[in-house]
Design a protein with these regions (language model features):
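Aromatic- and glycine-rich peptidoglycan recognition patches
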Residues: 4, 123-193
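Generic low-complexity segments that are intrinsically disordered, proline-rich and/or Lys/Arg-biased
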Residues: 26, 33-36, 81, 93, ...
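Alpha-helix initiation/capping motif
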Residues: 38-39, 61, 88, 93, ...
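Extended, compositionally biased low-complexity polar/Lys-Gly-rich tracts
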Residues: 41-48, 95-115, 163-190
């Protein structure tokens, strides 16, 4: 498996969940643009994030990103042992995950498609995460969980109620500052592929 294959897999998996909106804060979702409820998709999302270990009610941006990597790894037929290595390093907490990857010299300053973007809100322990889908100049396109379509405050920008596309500055914006990027190449090193 190459880093490009993994990147494509991560983006493909994350794209499946775009448009889900919270119907219960940080715990249940539905796509308002599809008929009926999206129970099968929501159950899959919850299952992928629970492995992180994420619990309903918790902020889920990093658990969403971790779950999308998990789904991509499974689709590329990695071993359970390799998946355990990924899960031992990535957590549902952005700042902790950044520290884990930095300690291993695997947190990059450069974004590439398929990377997980990790940011910190000011000097707090609160953070935000997203999956990079494209990079252009000083900006990146992302797919993010737990974000807002129209952020009216820093808090709503990092903890909204959608899984959707966003455009962000690579360095962050407002008090949301980029900590670094977990690239597909870093993920492959973690799992020993």
């Amino acid at each position: 498996m190459t880093s490009d294959q993994l990147a494509q897999g991560i983006i493909r998996q994350a794209s499946r969940f775009i448009g889900l909106r919270e119907v219960k804060p940080n715990a249940d979702w539905d796509n308002p643009n599809t008929p009926g409820n999206d129970r099968a998709l929501v159950d899959e999302l919850r299952s992928l994030m629970r492995q992180s270990p994420w619990e309903p009610g918790w902020a889920y941006c990093a658990a969403f990103a971790e779950g999308m990597v998990l789904a991509a790894l499974r689709s590329l037929a990695v071993t359970p042992e390799q998946i355990k290595r990924w899960q031992a390093t990535m957590t549902p907490h952005c700042v902790t995950s950044a520290a884990n990857f930095r300690t291993l010299s695997l947190l990059s300053e450069n974004a590439v498609p398929g990377s997980i973007w990790l940011a910190r809100h000011g000097s707090t322990s609160n953070g935000h995460a997203g999956i990079v889908t494209a990079v252009r100049g000083v900006s990146m396109a992302t797919i993010e969980g737990n974000t807002s379509l129209d952020p009216s405050s820093d808090a709503k920008e990092r903890e909204g109620d959608w899984i959707t596309h966003r455009i962000r500055f690579l360095k962050g914006s407002g008090t949301l500052n980029t900590l670094g990027f977990i690239t597909p190449a870093s993920i492959l090193k973690i799992i020993g592929a």
